[in-house]
Amino acid sequence: MMSLTVLSPPQRFKRILQAMMLAVAVVYMTLLLYQSAYGYPGIQVPHSQVDALASEAVTTHRDQLLQDYVQSSTPTQPGAGAPAASPTTVIIRKDIRSFNFSDIEVSERPTATLLTELARRSRNGELLRDLSQRAVTATPQPPVTELDDIFISVKTTKNYHDTRLALIIKTWFQLARDQTWFFTDTDDHYYQEKTKGHLINTKCSQGHFRKALCCKMSAELDVFLESGKKWFCHFDDDNYVNVPRLVKLLDEYSPSVDWYLGKPSISSPLEIHLDSKNTTTNKKITFWFATGGAGFCLSRALTLKMLPIAGGGKFISIGDKIRFPDDVTMGFIIEHLLKVPLTVVDNFHSHLEPMEFIRQDTFQDQVSFSYAHMKNQWNVIKVDGFDMKTDPKRFYSLHCQLFPYFSFCPPR
């Protein structure tokens, strides 16, 4: 005959507590498995998260209101050479009166509406879920970055279509044809066909001056935001991009985290002085910026924070206010307004540094290269291959060094 065991109240309480702990553990493990497999496909960023950011960008500068603009010239970049460590700040005298950020429109429509539209247009529904991962106790591993996750933009102009653009199309563009877009200032049916529709006429002014540069960068940023890609990488039309190395680099970082990857061309931060009539002391802003001539990359999480401040053409307005070119304006927005530091990646290279010092046995490790023709001399890499008359910019020789299977490469 079976006997019933009567548990005392403390024993019953202990059993109930054990059952509850088991249930919590099962639910927790289920959530972890679901998160790792599916993420958060339906997530929307709350109003407060982005509105607070936009508010900070406006209100933190209201105490610095001054009276009028005083125009000043754009500073020239320092000469070539690797930046040396220096405690001295580079001081750019920029006497701007009435530096007023209260008149920068944060958003013409509610932020949630803008982000909802971005999510709907996105070809990858899981992109926005990454924004909440830092608030989760058990954060999954960063997602693997593939070539198709990257939006590569190249800034060019009509006068360089037959020279710089043609050289890129024959070389590294062939490794990223679906991911690379050229931003120019005219219609060109020939190169529109050569790029399979990847030539965008920004309607910006022609020329290499501040207004035109900021206009094109603004267009690049807006097109990226609509693309749904995880990474935005900007390059100039005198850059050679080592596409596999770029993918490998970005795979080391998560697009869900605020990343500003690039390389400065100066050895210390840029300092802008703001003169005020209302105070006895000058205001100053200090920040780093990645030089556009070497290329730089932004994570999607960071660009979404930039959206209310610089999206929809507002990038141009900020460039007009500080009166600096596009790459400096980008650094001002990211480092100064959003307080996201530049992460220096030495594998980016611009024509402002001597190319000959990049060793041939390290070519496969570099992300970008460049060239320049100054004072009747070429600033180019030293690489075996075609002669200087055939390949003065050394891009064909470099390409064949990295990818010898291309048809125009000489047999080894």
Swiss-Prot record:
Domain of life assignment: Eukaryota
Binding site for substrate: R164, D237
Disulfides per UniProt: C204-C215, C233-C297, C400-C409
Record keyword Lyase present: no
Gene Ontology biological process terms, A to Z: compound eye development; compound eye morphogenesis; cuticle pattern formation; dorsal/ventral pattern formation, imaginal disc; female germ-line stem cell population maintenance; follicle cell of egg chamber development; germarium-derived egg chamber formation; imaginal disc-derived leg morphogenesis
UniProt-listed InterPro entries: Fringe, Fringe-like_glycosylTrfase
Membrane association type: Single-pass type II membrane protein
One Pfam family here: Fringe
Cofactor requirements of the protein: Mn(2+)
Membrane listed as a keyword: yes
Protein name: Fringe glycosyltransferase
Lineage, top ranks: Eukaryota, Metazoa, Ecdysozoa, Arthropoda, Hexapoda
Gene from which the chain derives: fng
